[in-house]
């Protein structure tokens, strides 16, 4: 049977876990086998910029950081379950990638 590999990524952990829990509930209701959500390593993007716009004065810097959290879910590709997953309301800061594997 085919499997669907669902990759979820977001900068907000709460909304990410909320979407993962919705997928988990759909899997339990439809009775398909599921593994996950597996937390993947958090990607940390760091940017250091100079505070002074003209280069004069003391060298002071701002440090900015963006964290991208990811989860991986493997689920059986049952038609009924996949249709319900496609209907989930996804927040703007969450991206979902669904890949069918055999």
UniProtKB/Swiss-Prot annotation:
Question: Which residue positions does the secretion signal occupy?
Answer: none
**GO MF annotations, alphabetized:** structural constituent of ribosome; tRNA binding
Sorted alphabetically, the keyword list is:
Ribonucleoprotein, Ribosomal protein
User: What SMART domains does UniProt report for this protein, alphabetically?
Assistant: Ribosomal_S10
Record's InterPro entries?
Ribosomal_uS10 (IPR001848), Ribosomal_uS10_CS (IPR018268), Ribosomal_uS10_dom (IPR027486), Ribosomal_uS10_dom_sf (IPR036838), Ribosomal_uS10_euk/arc (IPR005729)
Spell out the residue ranges making up region: Disordered.
Answer: 33-59
- One of the GO BP terms on file: translation
Q: Which GO terms describe its cellular component?
A: small ribosomal subunit
- Judging by the UniProt lineage, the source's domain of life is Archaea
Query: What binding partners and quaternary form does the record give?
Result: Part of the 30S ribosomal subunit.
What does the UniProt function comment say about this protein?
A: Involved in the binding of tRNA to the ribosomes.
Family per record:
Belongs to the universal ribosomal protein uS10 family.
Protein name in the entry: Small ribosomal subunit protein uS10
Q: Which organism is it from?
A: Pyrococcus furiosus (strain ATCC 43587 / DSM 3638 / JCM 8422 / Vc1)
């Amino acid at each position: 049977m085919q499997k669907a590999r669902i990759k979820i990524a977001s900068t907000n952990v709460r909304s990410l876990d909320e979407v993962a829990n919705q997928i988990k509930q759909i899997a339990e209701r439809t009775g398909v086998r599921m593994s996950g959500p597996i937390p993947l390593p958090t990607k940390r993007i760091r940017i250091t910029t100079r505070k002074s716009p003209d280069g004069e004065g003391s060298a002071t810097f701002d440090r900015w950081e963006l964290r991208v959290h990811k989860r991986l879910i493997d689920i059986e590709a049952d038609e009924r379950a996949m249709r319900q997953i496609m209907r989930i309301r996804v927040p703007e800061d969450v991206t979902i990638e669904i890949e069918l594997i055999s």
